[in-house]
């Protein structure tokens, strides 16, 4: 939690004034029982109406000043807590945007979503309550004990015993629950992950009648969450009844002791009432303090989870080797890659070159490493061994910004953002003019439907839900083309296009004036047969590299893929 306090640095004044005004309010509260004692012992005993009225007005004044102090404290506490949470949320969001693909895979989007929403809210609530109660409640408990000593030391000893017992209960429950709250948050991540997975795959689940299976899976996750919450709740639920029992026993003993002291003339009735009020104040404040500790316990658990994300190592490793070794657009030299330490290589000993302006096809079975291979070029992931060069230079010697200006990628899942088409295309080149954007739209074979929907000002809903799959893919390609990249990667990003549109797209890519090197990842040999070079992957190994005709002759994996799509040798002969 201490590491997160840096986000309070802009709210030092509010963090000082909030507890200060709460202490002012508490001071007036501690004086009230003494005034009431005076009303009983002086005003009522002597029948002095003027004294009673003056002291009642004094109580009203204390109440008004206390209320103003409380409102002011609440304002400063809320301002500091909201500002703290806003800064923390900004840093967390920025950190998430800096995470590499491998870290995103490892942590999980559902977990990150929980951290930036629920966990930040928990910490915000904790900060708010701490600023308002952390000093006020102990101050009143301590002050009430001191006041009790000034009235009667014997009664004050009873106060100290009750406070000591309550402290054991409160801190004992806190220690028992703090780890449980962290477990609850982790299980909540699992529930959210299951929910997210089901929502994203709803159509597939229903297509295969998997609702019952997925429901059972969710019930299992949710039941575990419920079990953790109930076990923690049972412990937390002991807090209020145990504190009430201890306080009420203390009050009972106090009243009995006070009655004896009044009968012997040691204490007055007003003093006993004052002692009772101080005991009641201790009760109220200890309950507040107990609830504060529960909230702070949750906040500490959430703060630890937030800190784990903020401390993730996102430092990209760069190479000092900026030497240009050759004129190849892309070169892989004995490249291997695995996603996790100790895991099997997703790619193993890959070597090939791509020349400027070439169209390179990448094909292979499911899980063969196609997406992994092209993802290494813009450094979505880093190679475990070997060297990758872009324009003859080690890819690790480029800054990510410089590299990704050269390399534009269209991913398997076409992602568009809410706004206009123009706003989406500017992601590819923030300085692009309308003419350049229209040229990119035309090259992506999207001009017809874009024109019919309002041109560059056409509205796009979140994730492009108002467009078909093929339309989203074409606009994603247009966005990549706007930047005039030196290297364009199409990762199975034309799968939703019909053959006619796909053929027109291939022709447009070949005719681009800047002649980029194009990598086309596809499952369809028809999409790659005109490529200058085709890379054939099988279980992470490069088993073939050449033209379509050459691979049909000498690569059994490619031949098998081709035959499965076109019916064997007869189709090949044609």
How would you label these PLM feature ranges?
Residues 10, 14-27, 59-62, 68, ...:
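Transmembrane helices of ABC transporter permease
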Residues 46-47, 82, 90-114, 118-120, ...:
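Short intracellular "coupling" helices and adjacent cytoplasmic loop segments at the cytosolic face
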Residues 59-70, 163-167, 236-250, 256, ...:
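Hydrophobic alpha-helical segments in the permease module
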Residues 196-200, 206, 210, 234, ...:
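Cytosolic ends of transmembrane helices, especially the final helix of ABC transmembrane type-1 domains
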Residues 20-21, 25-37, 41, 53, ...:
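Juxtamembrane helix-loop junctions of ABC transporter transmembrane domains
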């Amino acid at each position: 939690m201490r590491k997160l306090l840096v986000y309070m640095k802009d709210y030092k004044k509010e963090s000082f004034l909030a507890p200060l005004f709460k202490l002012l309010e508490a001071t007036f509260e501690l004086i009230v029982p003494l005034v009431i004692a005076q009303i009983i012992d002086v005003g009522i005993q002597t029948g002095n109406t003027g004294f009673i009225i003056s002291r009642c007005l004094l109580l009203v004044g204390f109440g008004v000043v206390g209320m103003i102090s409380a409102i002011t404290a609440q304002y400063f506490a809320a301002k500091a807590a909201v500002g703290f949470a806003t800064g923390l949320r900004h840093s967390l969001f920025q950190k998430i945007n800096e995470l590499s693909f491998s870290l995103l895979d490892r942590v999980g989007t559902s977990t990150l979503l929980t951290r930036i929403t629920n966990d930040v809210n928990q910490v915000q609530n904790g900060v708010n309550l701490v600023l308002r109660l952390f000093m006020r409640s102990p101050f009143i408990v301590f002050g009430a004990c001191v006041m009790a000593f000034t009235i009667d030391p014997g009664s004050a000893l009873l106060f100290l015993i009750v406070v000591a017992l309550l402290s054991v209960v409160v801190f004992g429950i806190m220690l028992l629950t703090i780890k449980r709250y962290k477990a609850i948050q982790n299980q909540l991540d699992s529930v959210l992950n299951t929910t997210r997975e089901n929502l994203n795959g709803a159509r597939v689940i229903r297509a295969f009648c998997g609702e019952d299976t997925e429901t059972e899976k969710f019930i299992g996750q949710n039941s575990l969450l419920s079990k953790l919450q109930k076990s923690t709740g049972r412990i937390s639920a002991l807090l209020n009844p145990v504190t009430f029992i201890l306080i009420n026993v203390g009050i009972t003993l106090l009243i009995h002791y006070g009655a004896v002291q009044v009968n012997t003339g040691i204490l007055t009735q007003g003093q006993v009432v004052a002692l009772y009020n101080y005991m009641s104040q201790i009760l109220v404040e200890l309950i507040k303090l107990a609830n504060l500790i529960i909230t702070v316990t949750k906040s500490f658990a959430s703060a630890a989870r937030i800190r784990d994300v903020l401390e993730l190592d996102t430092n990209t490793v760069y190479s000092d080797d900026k030497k240009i070794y050759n004129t190849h657009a892309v070169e892989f030299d004995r490249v291997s890659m695995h996603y996790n330490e100790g895991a099997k290589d997703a790619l193993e000993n890959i070597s090939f070159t791509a020349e400027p302006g070439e169209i390179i096809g990448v094909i292979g079975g499911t899980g063969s490493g196609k997406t992994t291979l092209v993802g290494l070029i813009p450094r979505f992931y880093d190679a475990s061994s070997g060297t990758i060069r872009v324009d003859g230079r080690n890819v690790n010697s480029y800054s990510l910004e410089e590299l990704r200006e050269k390399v534009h990628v269209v991913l398997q899942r076409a992602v568009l953002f809410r706004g206009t088409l123009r706003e989406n295309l500017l992601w590819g080149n923030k300085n692009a003019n309308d003419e350049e954007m229209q040229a990119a739209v035309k090259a992506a074979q999207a001009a017809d439907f874009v024109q019919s929907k309002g041109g560059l000002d056409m509205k796009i809903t979140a994730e492009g839900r108002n467009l078909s799959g093929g339309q989203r893919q074409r606009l994603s390609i247009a966005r990549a083309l706007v930047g005039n990249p030196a290297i364009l990667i199409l990762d199975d990003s034309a799968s939703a296009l019909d053959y006619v549109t796909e053929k027109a797209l291939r022709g447009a890519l070949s005719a681009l004036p800047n002649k980029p090197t194009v990598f086309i990842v596809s499952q369809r040999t028809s999409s790659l047969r005109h490529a200058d070079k085709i890379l054939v992957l099988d279980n992470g190994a490069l088993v073939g590299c050449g033209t379509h005709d050459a691979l049909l002759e000498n690569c059994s994996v490619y031949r098998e893929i081709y035959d499965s799509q076109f019916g064997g040798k007869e189709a090949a002969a044609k």
